[in-house]
């Protein structure tokens, strides 16, 4: 990890109005940057290196943590895209406090109408975004359009029987939206029902025929590469410090990892690294 934030930097970030009103206002800021470094920036090294002429795009950047982590830890040029202009401005201010705002090209836009030229990014990241766009095939194709070499995607897996990102009710996300809403309300989970529409591995890959899966466990090159990220701070609601996965989860992950590139079909997260076919 690069030097910890100073007290002044942390206070300045938490004082940014858009960030200070959000659900992530109390996250561990150092831990958050470290999370994105260890879970996304460093694992890319198993597939490719980055030089100062390479462009990494962070699609749906939110408060910019992934873009900031790439700016802090690689020489690459970064493009950060978000459809919420106010949130993007907050991300730019966070990056400014950390001294890397000049390393990042901030653009307002959305999947399906991305403000990038064809193949402008060597690597495009889309982390926990496509579940919020419906099942827009054009939006996923747009991701393939802007990436000249690689795509890294994470999103809940439609095939998995429970989605923690949603209501967490078994099989509920397989139901039509009206029935999902009724079930969520009946179980006291209506506040977590956001009408997200999830993608299956088959449907996602069908929209990106020019790309093939190269990761063997989630978006990592191996199950071991995932394990060495622990212990780790997880900056999501309900996250916090994780020493390791639980026993049953660890056993399941170990078994599924034996499927190699096909493991994404059985994982709760449809996370994968894709490379353009030669």
Model-identified regions with their sequence ranges:
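Conserved N-terminal segment of class I S-adenosyl-L-methionine
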Residues: 1-118, 127, 140, 265-277
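A short SAM/SAH-binding and catalytic strip from SAM-dependent methyltransferases
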Residues: 123-134
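A short glycine-rich, Lys/Arg-flanked "PGG" loop and its adjoining helix->strand segment in the class I
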Residues: 137-151
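Conserved class I S-adenosyl-L-methionine
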Residues: 152-179
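Short alpha-helix
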Residues: 193-212
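Conserved S-adenosyl-L-methionine
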Residues: 212-222
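Conserved Class I S-adenosyl-L-methionine
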Residues: 244-271
